[in-house]
Amino acid sequence: MELFGHTKDVIRANYFYLMERMCPSKISDAHDIPIIINNYNRLTMLKKLIDSLTSRGYTNIVILDNQSTYPPLLEWYAKCEFEVIRLPKNYGFKALWKYAPVRKRFCSDYYIYTDPDVQLSPECPADVIERMFHILKC
């Protein structure tokens, strides 16, 4: 089994190497990577996540809304400085892949996909996304 696990890692590394050569990323800076937040009726956690991201300098934030009905959230969306994409129905956690317009827009390059209840730990390095981006680009 150890050999198979290693083989998967080699295949994965070769896949990313070849993809970068055949379809090079248009993204040259980690701060340009879109951070897509899948949301449904969550305001408090969404604001905390966005505050955490913006405090680290990330502003390319897109919110996928799964037909939320919570009035305070809808009011906040109206004033929100980030792009909010109101989906035609609730696609659940797979919204990015199930709704073709957003899949086509974001899935051809680097992106980060999360829910609002995933929070960055205070111990998390401020440059964690830059570190991951550097590893992917190597």
Please annotate each region the language model reported.
Residues 52-89:
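Acidic donor-binding segment of Leloir-type glycosyltransferases
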Residues 94-110:
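Active-site nucleotide-sugar/metal-binding loop of Leloir-type enzymes
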Residues 35-37, 63, 113:
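Structural beta-sheet core signal
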Residues 107-121:
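Short beta-strand-to-loop acidic/aromatic patch adjacent to the donor-nucleotide binding site
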Residues 38-39, 66-67, 119-120:
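Preference for well-ordered, secondary-structure-rich cores of eukaryotic proteins
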Residues 124-138:
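Conserved donor-nucleotide/metal-binding helix-loop-beta segment in metal-dependent transferases, i.e.
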Residues 2-51:
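N-proximal low-complexity "stem/linker" segments adjacent to membrane-targeting elements
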Residues 42-43, 117-121, 135:
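Short acidic, S/G/P-rich loop/turn micro-motifs used as interaction or catalytic elements
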